[in-house]
Amino acid sequence: MATSALDDVVLIASAAKDSHIVAFDARTGAVVKQYVAKDGAAALCVSNCERIIAIAPDKRAMTTHGVDKESLERASVLPERPSAVCASRDGAYVASGSASGTCAVWEARSGRLLARFKAHFKGVTTMTFTPCGSALVTGGEDGAVHAWRVSALCDDGGAGTRANAWRSWTEHALGVSGVTCGSVAGAGGDVSVVSCSADRTCKIYSLGNGTTLRQVRCPTALTCCALDACEATLYAGGVDGRVFEIPLNGAPSVAASLDGGIDARDGMVALVGHSKKLVSVRCSSDGNSIISASEDGTARVWDVASRQTLHILRHPKAPISDIALIPRSRYSGQGRGDYGADRKRAKTLPAPTFSKFLIGPGDRSGLKPWQGTSVSISGISKKRAVDASQTVVHDDAPTTSGAVDDDARAALAKKSTELDRARAEVEEWKKLYGDLKSLVDRQLVDAP
């Protein structure tokens, strides 16, 4: 059963100093937990409903909190100061972008750095994974939106090489401020990608064939966007504090816009309530509610049907920098069906330290003996005991080590002979080349 926003816990982060990441119950507006973040959080994401990953403002650091623990679990130092962060829905990958336009992808369980590549000419402003986790979508200050195949980025054989974008869209006139992906897959696994920009437009693309499906122009510069579960409505946040509700299933006829222009789409509605720029918009899974956050220090839970504010969630320290959603069953331990039971029985491993060094292509494993997650094989201790009891050492048993050494020496001698023969041929060809050059010089160059 899909969870609505009223069954979700809203994580609200602030970039202010000594401000915590506060978890609110969207149903009652009560504070559920406060996660320690001494330096604040410029952006955050949730990995598999188990860990909260945040980036510290003005620092080359990325922090990890367990959902069940309020204290900081792990802090990782990065090569550059991150400007955006995201995690795949299945919790397999974590990615970050920096102001230099560089992106990095880690394996979430071990912290191994899988790829580090130049994604944009200018800074990376926003990024997200597709619902299946097979592609990473990034947006930058250069106005470009790129989609990258995770399988190509994480290929060990291609480590250290320049990455090539799978899909690229460069239709925005100004920097991209937000990207999101639809949760409904079309034919062949096609996914809709939406981007918004300070040029007041939202653009909808097809990830399958790379075409631009639609463009919607709004009355003001946009900062964030979100799609509902059915991809029937697009929500975009503006710098003036308004949330624009844009129906996508209606006819794209041109009508008068909210500010008197002629380039808005018919049926656009503005949700008014915030007094400052919006920083994030999130949709519930069933599409009944949306949650918007603003720099005015408040997050509002809106009812989609009535377009009224249900709750106002206030962070102790403004401005708000980002929000994320976690199912409330993850906190209460009383899930619906098997979901809550699995979560209650599961034991999470310690949070890894995200590496800042990329393993070269020569090392296929990419892990040192002390790195990576622990692997437990049931029954291995019993098998070792049985093998040890059945092992008998015979000192007089014949061995084949001498024969193996003789074969190795013979193979080495053969290779050495072939090498000497090749070197002799090279010297012979050099001599022939020198004689030919001397002949040409005498007959053609020095001839009267």
Predicted segments with their positions:
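Residue-level detector of Asp-centered blade-edge/turn motifs that repeat once per structural unit
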Residues: 3-6, 47-49, 89-90, 131-132, ...
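WD40-repeat beta-propellers
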Residues: 21-24, 62-67, 103-106, 145-149, ...
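Short C-terminal beta-strands that terminate individual repeats in beta-propeller domains
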Residues: 32-36, 72-78, 113-119, 156-160, ...
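Short loop/turn segments immediately following beta-strands, especially the blade-tip
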Residues: 149-159, 247-258
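Terminal intrinsically disordered, low-complexity extensions flanking WD-repeat/beta-propeller proteins
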Residues: 256-257, 266, 306-448
